[in-house]
């Protein structure tokens, strides 16, 4: 309920906020498509083609820029971009994560430099965290703050050394329903 009210603060009632949230989830998961299975197959094929193209390019780094963001992430040699699909033990294709809109890879954990500001809230362990700003140097978080939930965010990041480095980076097209 708290998340529904956060996403739809102008809903007339708690029930309407929850209904609106479910409606968005169903749209994002392509449930309303005439043939949802076909829609997901086509979408997965597009994501796979993007991952294949990125794998051929083998960029050395990604540079993210936006208001409040200027972050360069180094990519390891021979990195692999993945997309939506996976193969189970029986050799059958499936989508383990829905909705999925991104292609993703693992960055070089030693090569993250700059800062990023979150444009969306984060829900962690029952806490809503907003206005997150993270600064990286040589792959490690050196500063982090949040307008709301600052201490929760700091505790999350500084509870172990591994939490201070990035383990994944993703590319999501701007018109995506989750961007």
Protein language model annotation of sequence segments:
Residues 1-113:
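Active-site bordering "gate/hinge" segments
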Residues 103-155:
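Long, well-ordered mid-to-C-terminal structural blocks that present hydrophobic/aromatic surfaces
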Residues 113, 143-179:
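Dual-mode signal for accessory low-complexity, basic/Gly-rich regions
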């Amino acid at each position: 309920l708290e998340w529904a009210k956060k996403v739809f603060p102008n809903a007339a009632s708690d029930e309407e906020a929850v209904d609106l949230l479910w409606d968005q989830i169903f749209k994002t998961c392509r449930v309303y498509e005439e043939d949802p299975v076909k829609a997901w197959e086509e979408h997965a094929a597009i994501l796979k083609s993007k991952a294949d193209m990125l794998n051929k390019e083998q960029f050395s780094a990604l540079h993210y820029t936006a208001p409040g963001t200027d972050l360069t992430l180094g990519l390891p040699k021979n990195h692999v971009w993945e997309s939506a699909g996976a193969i189970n033990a029986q050799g059958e294709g499936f989508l383990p994560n829905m909705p999925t809109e991104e292609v993703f890879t693992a960055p070089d954990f030693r090569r993250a430099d700059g800062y990023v500001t979150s444009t969306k809230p984060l829900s962690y362990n029952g806490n809503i965290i907003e206005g997150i700003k993270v600064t990286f140097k040589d792959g490690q978080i050196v500063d982090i703050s949040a307008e709301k939930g600052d201490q929760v965010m700091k505790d999350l990041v500084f509870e172990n050394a591994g939490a201070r480095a990035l383990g994944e980076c993703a590319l999501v097209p701007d018109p995506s329903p989750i961007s």
